[in-house]
Structure formats: structure tokens, C-alpha cells
């Protein structure tokens, strides 16, 4: 059972990007599990940031709306891209490091 996750990046009240978790573009849709984690998928937050990068759109100052609490890797990418708020709907394997790094960078982490 795969979790379905979506992410919107919003800046100045406009959606600048969207992403959902899915297989790596151009690769076969096959499950490759290593260390109990799927290796062939890209997370929703990663896809949204990559979409901005491909189109030359800055994420600086944007808000991320995510269906689920972000993993630590996605959190680091969101923070490094300049996201200033992360809002999520559902708790999912909440990692305390996400709160820690958000706090270090004064990024609001808000459960909706």
C-alpha cells in the first residue's frame, strides 16, 4: 500500500507549483524496495520543487501545503529552497528533526 501525497507551493496567493509522489519520470513503474523504503519514487515536495527549478520559478518566501507531515529529506529541501511556511493535513511518521530545523530557520510548521 503506497501513501498518496500531494504538495502545492503558494506565493503571493497564487499556486506556483504542484507535485505528487510517483515514479521517477521516464522510468518503468516498478517497485524497488531497499531498507524497507521505495527507491523508484519521487516525493510530492521534491516534484514540486523540481517543477519550479525546471521553469525558473523561485520558491523563496513561498508556503508549502502538503497532505502529510514531510519527511526529513523533503523538509531539508523545502527549507533550502526558501520556503517560509509548511502547512500539512495529516501526521505521518513525524520526525522531531523536522520541527528542529524549521525552528532553526524560523519557518512555521503548521498542522491544518
Which residues does each predicted region cover?
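Zinc-dependent deaminase catalytic domain
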Residues: 1-112
